[in-house]
Amino acid sequence: MFNGAVSLLFLFLAVVSARADPTFNDDVLGLIVFKAGLDDPLSKLSSWNSEDYDPCNWVGCTCDPATNRVSELRLDAFSLSGHIGRGLLRLQFLHTLVLSNNNLTGTLNPEFPHLGSLQVVDFSGNNLSGRIPDGFFEQCGSLRSVSLANNKLTGSIPVSLSYCSTLTHLNLSSNQLSGRLPRDIWFLKSLKSLDFSHNFLQGDIPDGLGGLYDLRHINLSRNWFSGDVPSDIGRCSSLKSLDLSENYFSGNLPDSMKSLGSCSSIRLRGNSLIGEIPDWIGDIATLEILDLSANNFTGTVPFSLGNLEFLKDLNLSANMLAGELPQTLSNCSNLISIDVSKNSFTGDVLKWMFTGNSESSSLSRFSLHKRSGNDTIMPIVGFLQGLRVLDLSSNGFTGELPSNIWILTSLLQLNMSTNSLFGSIPTGIGGLKVAEILDLSSNLLNGTLPSEIGGAVSLKQLHLHRNRLSGQIPAKISNCSALNTINLSENELSGAIPGSIGSLSNLEYIDLSRNNLSGSLPKEIEKLSHLLTFNISHNNITGELPAGGFFNTIPLSAVTGNPSLCGSVVNRSCLSVHPKPIVLNPNSSNPTNGPALTGQIRKSVLSISALIAIGAAAVIAIGVVAVTLLNVHARSSVSRHDAAAALALSVGETFSCSPSKDQEFGKLVMFSGEVDVFDTTGADALLNKDSELGRGGFGVVYKTSLQDGRPVAVKKLTVSGLIKSQEEFEREMRKLGKLRHKNVVEIKGYYWTQSLQLLIHEFVSGGSLYRHLHGDESVCLTWRQRFSIILGIARGLAFLHSSNITHYNMKATNVLIDAAGEAKVSDFGLARLLASALDRCVLSGKVQSALGYTAPEFACRTVKITDRCDVYGFGILVLEVVTGKRPVEYAEDDVVVLCETVREGLEEGRVEECVDPRLRGNFPAEEAIPVIKLGLVCGSQVPSNRPEMEEVVKILELIQCPSHDLE
């Protein structure tokens, strides 16, 4: 309060001084008033002083020498916050105003463009919000350049924009603008650069674009535009870059594009364009970047591409192209990257690259993933030494690896997996000093793994599985200190596992299964603290498995097939090792008393043998007694602790078990390593009807407590008959137990018997989202709480998808709210337990979500179910959270489907009907509308039209308006 009074007093004195002293002009007053509305944490504006009547010396200010008035104000990246005050309207001679890359908030003042001299306005990179006022462009005078990019502006583009006939540069990218482009936008005949990318704009591009003869750059990417690519775009003869990627454009490329003779970049990826790639594409001689990926182009690659001598980046991936790659591509000597993966190419597709007539090449990336054919890989020639990424996987290549492929010393990634390559791995492999990924898996390679592999010191992933490699694993592999993945499975490797592997501290994944490895496991592997997967199954490994840490939870399937391996995992005890008996040398004799000594030796040997026999008998007798006592103790201990803890769970009417003579003992695993975690003294109350929290398709959830009093939730699974084996169950549990995210419920452990499986996870005190939305009518979530919940669910799902886990069952009852109001996704990963029964269970309703949440692809057996089904469920959840209504509700004579109701309301402009009436209008429309639209997009009937959850998170973070506090 005191500071506010001082600021007002200061401004009053400034105004009085201005009236009293004619030298104190409007510029000084305007700048001081503007500064008063800012927070300047770095004191960048310390030189702005009302006692200094000459602002021309102030930081960021530039004056016109003719008038001695401020003509430029540049405060970009000053770390300023606050709002853009009206004081700047006093700067009548200002022609450049740059406030970019700060943290300014608030809405746009429609009067700024009215400054008669103003030519450049740059407010980009701030946190401005609200709509662009209709009056912002109505009297734009001599305005030349406007950038409002990277803010949080909402609403539609004002029609008044067409009045700014002098505008040459317009950038409204990376906001939350929606609606259609104004039809009169192409009246801006002076436009040279237009960027509307990364918004929510939609509809067809209006006619008239071809009238912008001076247009150099246009970027409409990452929107929801549809229809055809404008047919008159070729009339923009000055165009240098065109980006329409990540939209919904369809149809063929318009022939008028061949007139874009000055264009250097064409990006059309991620649309639904069809037809063949036209021959005239090779007539755009200035092209440097051509990206037509992720469309529906068919036919062959035109030979005319070889005419593009300046081409640097060519991406034709993820189309339906066929035939061969034209050899004319070798004429494109400036190519840096080419990606033609995920097509149907046949024939000799590499000849153009390996028989180039250039002495040098700048090619650094080549990808030809997934195509059909059985060609040989031609020798790598020297002009490809700049290659950094080479992906030739899944192509049916035959022959040997090129002996000189290792001269590609710049390679970061080499993938030749899933071909029919044979022969040995060249010893020059060590020349790949900077390579991070080497994948030669699923081939017919033989011979040994050369010790020179240790020269590839930057290697992070080594995939050589499914080959015919023999010999030993070289100890020098430990030189590759960055390795996190080693997969040598399904080969013919022999010998012992080198102890040097234990020095690879970053290792997370080791698979040496299905080889002929022998010897004992080196003790050094116990040091590998980051291990997630360790598989040595089906070898001849002997000795004892390590104990403790990761190896406590290793599945039986990871070590099975090693008959001489012992330890708790294989349920085989390790025999004690006794010192060898002393053997006397019978040839050591004294010539003087040979016979006597011989007899003495015999007596000694006999006595030693007798002692050994007696000792062995005693050891056996003691061992039998000890084992008996230990068994008695162990049985009583198990019954007191683990068995009591687990079997007590069957007490109560919902856990009644049929009597059996042989009591079944289970396996209890807590990922924290805690022992005796359950308080078993009150077994009757551990899991019974009174402690039940809820029921679902997979089982019943109960609340109980650990011995230290911490509450946990325990789920009794009801899908026991569908789970294949204990090993698969435990493997999946360990994967789920490693997941840690604030928006995902933590799995703490599990319990297994053949007839009973329990999941132990954290107890979330706030209950389900369903209860918060549809439970107590007197409780109403605020908008801020609802937005936080939506964002939390999105982040949790994105995390699960990044961990290759699909939920399959997104609904309000599977989202829990903790005491802090944070959303946590629960009940995830359970479908993975069902293995081959998954499809049957999905279609029978075991995994399906409740009514209204189920993605339409579940009803079609021919459609692959992917993680996009979760995106659909999320979209329905978003609408449920915003509206407060269930996905499907029943009226007297009708069924109301939420998604359809919201879509109709939004299209008809009845936004208030799309938001929970209990909020009584207390919500920011600039947040609510984009959130609703996002929910509708996520709930699209077509899986490919739904965004990925990672993208959804980014969109929500853009939508969020921290300046609004509507609690």
Curated annotation (Swiss-Prot):
UniProt cross-references to SMART domains, sorted A to Z: LRR_TYP
Range of residues in the leader sequence: 1-20
Membrane side Cytoplasmic: residue ranges: 631-967
Tissue: Expressed in the vascular strands of cotyledons, the shoot apex, hypocotyls, roots, leaves, stems and flowers.
Superkingdom in the source lineage: Eukaryota
LRR repeats, residue ranges: 91-114, 115-139, 141-164, 165-189, 191-212, 214-236, 237-260, 262-284, 285-307, 308-332, 334-356, 384-408, 410-432, 433-456, 457-480, 482-503, 504-528, 530-552
GO molecular function: ATP binding; protein kinase activity
Keyword ATP-binding: yes
Any single Pfam family the record assigns to this protein: LRR_1
Locations listed in the record: Cell membrane
Membrane topology listed for this record: Single-pass type I membrane protein
Record carries keyword Ion transport: no
Family matches, as InterPro entries: Kinase-like_dom_sf (IPR011009), Leu-rich_rpt (IPR001611), Leu-rich_rpt_typical-subtyp (IPR003591), LRR_dom_sf (IPR032675), LRR_N_plant-typ (IPR013210), Plant_RL_S/T_kinase (IPR051716), Prot_kinase_dom (IPR000719), Protein_kinase_ATP_BS (IPR017441)
Membrane-spanning parts: 610-630
Domain Protein kinase: 687-959
UniProt keywords, alphabetically: ATP-binding, Cell membrane, Glycoprotein, Leucine-rich repeat, Membrane, Nucleotide-binding, Receptor, Repeat, Signal, Transmembrane, Transmembrane helix
GO cellular-component term (any): plasma membrane
PROSITE patterns recorded: PROTEIN_KINASE_ATP (PS00107), PROTEIN_KINASE_DOM (PS50011)
Extracellular side: 21-609
Domain notes: The protein kinase domain is predicted to be catalytically inactive.
Function comment: Leucine-rich repeat receptor-like protein kinase that may play a role in vascular tissues development.
UniProt record similarity statement: Belongs to the protein kinase superfamily. Ser/Thr protein kinase family.
Official protein name in the record: Leucine-rich repeat receptor-like protein kinase PXC2
